[in-house]
């Protein structure tokens, strides 16, 4: 059993924010693997299905980014999912735009969504860091991550989503 988590903020005006790239990845996984219709459960939008013969859950927390851990803990406790079977997709300023880095455990590196998950389930889970790059002009990081992607960046996010979908093997 696996749990895919996409981090983001649940407001309609946040849909194309850099901070919401995790939600975009979950939407792509849901579509690619024909997971169930999203249902509001465990303080998130939950889908279920199978990838190969493996049971999969995918969730977009509705608790806002900085409280994502609450949603994840409820879900893993209910379905008895080990933290080691959780894969979190999230934005990362320290990774060049269009690049992906995966890691298991470690620090939150200042990402409040990851810090929240660490607080509620520990650090023994996988993270897929999706590069959004750093701001090109003098802009606060908090403002940058809440800006919408440019059109050409959205095309890059689609390529990243396709690459992740092709890489999912259980």
Positions of PLM-derived features:
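Nucleotide and nucleotide-moiety/phosphate-recognizing core
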Residues: 2-104, 115, 119-128, 135-140, ...
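Phosphate- and other anionic-substrate recognition elements at nucleic-acid/protein interfaces
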Residues: 108
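A hydrophobic, small-residue-rich beta->alpha segment in the mid-to-C-terminal subdomain
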Residues: 151-152
């Amino acid at each position: 059993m696996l749990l895919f988590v996409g981090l983001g903020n649940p407001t309609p005006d946040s849909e194309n924010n850099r901070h919401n790239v995790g939600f975009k990845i979950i939407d792509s996984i849901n579509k690619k693997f024909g997971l169930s219709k999203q249902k509001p459960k465990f303080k998130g939008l939950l889908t279920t299905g199978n990838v190969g013969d493996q049971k999969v859950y995918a969730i977009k927390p509705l608790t806002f980014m900085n409280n994502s851990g609450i949603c994840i803990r409820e879900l893993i406790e209910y379905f008895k999912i080990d933290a080691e079977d959780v894969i979190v997709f999230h934005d990362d300023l320290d990774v060049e735009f269009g690049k992906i880095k995966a890691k298991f455990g470690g620090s939150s590196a200042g990402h409040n969504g990851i810090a929240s998950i660490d607080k509620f389930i520990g650090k023994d889970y996988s993270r897929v860091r999706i590069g959004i790059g750093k701001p090109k002009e003098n802009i606060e990081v908090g403002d940058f991550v809440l800006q919408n992607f440019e059109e050409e960046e959205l095309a890059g996010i689609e390529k990243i989503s396709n690459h992740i979908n092709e890489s999912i093997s259980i």
